């Protein structure tokens, strides 16, 4: 067992990366003290865990968009149209899209689209099946990246034929690249 550290280590030392091997007693950090057993001594010693790798693993860039609501937040029937857009401040990679309609469409599926600078990101558009509230998860991306400065727009391209569906929330799961 090694000697105790010669200096006191503070939380700010850990955050700003000023803790070095001289500050740690031998064997002070072990897998027994780490709850996630996927982190092993071999991975740490072999350089498999780095600050860059850890930072890249947490660059989630998720966002949501609401359609089919009035100015007071009450549900209104969806119509076929563009509902709005946003300007991306950074490069992203799309991972998934989720859709949920407060009122399910009936008679026909509700179909929505997300476009980059006017071009769809899908080869198979996301759908909420007639009688369902959540999307069927059968969409297929044709494009998975977008760049800083791109205009991301949200569209409804088909509504239910008996009941249009209303209160559509679309969540985009993405990562900063």
Would you name each region that the model predicts?
Residues 154-162:
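Short beta-strand-plus-loop segments that form exposed binding edges in beta-rich domains
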Residues 22-25, 32, 43, 49, ...:
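Secondary-structure boundary/capping motif
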Residues 1-62:
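Fibrous stalk/shaft segments of extracellular and virion attachment machinery
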Residues 9, 14, 44, 49, ...:
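Hydrophobic beta-strand residues in large extracellular and virion-surface proteins
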Residues 56-111, 161-177:
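Beta-sheet-rich sandwich/jelly-roll-like modules and their strand-loop junctions
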Residues 18, 92, 147-150:
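Surface-exposed loop/turn positions
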Residues 100-148:
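Terminal beta-strand-rich extracellular "head" domains
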């Amino acid at each position: 067992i090694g000697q105790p550290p010669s200096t006191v280590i503070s939380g700010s030392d850990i955050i700003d990366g000023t803790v070095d091997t001289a500050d740690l007693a031998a064997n002070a950090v072990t897998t027994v003290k780490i709850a996630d057993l996927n982190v092993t001594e071999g991975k740490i010693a072999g350089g498999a865990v780095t600050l860059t790798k850890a930072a890249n693993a947490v660059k989630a860039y998720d966002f949501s968009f609401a359609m089919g609501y009035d100015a007071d937040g009450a549900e209104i029937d969806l119509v076929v149209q563009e509902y709005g857009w946003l300007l991306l401040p950074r490069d992203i990679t799309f991972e998934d899209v989720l859709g949920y309609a407060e009122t399910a469409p009936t008679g026909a599926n509700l179909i929505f689209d997300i476009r980059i600078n006017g071009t769809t990101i899908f080869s198979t558009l996301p759908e909420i099946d007639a009688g369902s509230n959540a999307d069927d998860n059968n969409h297929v991306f044709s494009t998975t990246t977008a760049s800083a400065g791109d205009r991301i727009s949200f569209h409804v391209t088909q509504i239910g034929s008996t009941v249009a569906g209303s209160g559509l929330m679309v969540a985009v799961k993405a990562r900063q690249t």
